Amino acid sequence: NGLQRLWYCFHADCNVSGRTGVTLSKDTSKDIFTPKQQPLSITNRFSEFEMPDTFVSVGRSLDAELYLRRVRAYDAYLAGAVDLRYDVRMNRVVFLIRDGKKIVDAAGRALDGRGPKWYRYGSSRSPFVSGTSSSVACVVEDCASACSVCSVVSGVALLGTNLLTEHIEVLKQYDRVFVALDKDATDKAITMVRT
């Protein structure tokens, strides 16, 4: 099908860059992977998403801004590559999930350690995508990791480690795909690459 798959496992939102002597810098990545086409939108096959009225600007929470800076997602927010909110009721940074210009879901990251680390607000199984101007995708587990790579390639967050049909449909739109799951999901990453 012409889709090229490359695999190298690293945690995208930390300082680890893979095995010793192997790095993927922003400049070398841009030289290697020249965008060929704009990814297409996917069709949301789920019910309409209604954004809760507890979502406010990220700037209303210092903890939210500090979290975004720590995981290297704040620059993507400032550049307009992602649409973020703060959920005042649940104390979460909220990453809005889009299909084109339409908001179809949201994923929230807990800031206080109470409740689940990540919470999916809607019923869509769409992945979170950031940096849609590239023909190269980097598959990661969470939204923050997708934001941390979106200045170089498109970040596609699975919101977990399971590869769903909806994720595959999005990934088919890219010429090259990296899989960069956390170290504890290495076996799943290898399975994805072989799929």
Question: Which residues fall in each region the model found?
Answer:
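A structural-propensity feature for long, helix-poor, extended segments
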Residues: 173-186
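Single, functionally critical "micro-switch" positions that shape active/binding sites
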Residues: 1, 140, 181
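Short, surface-exposed linear patches
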Residues: 32, 77-78, 159-162, 179-180
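Phosphate-handling DNA/RNA-contact segment within nucleic-acid enzymes
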Residues: 87-176
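Short, intrinsically disordered, charge-balanced linker/junction segments flanking boundaries
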Residues: 192-195
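Non-catalytic accessory segments of DNA primases and related replication-initiation nucleases
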Residues: 1-77, 81, 88-92, 100, ...
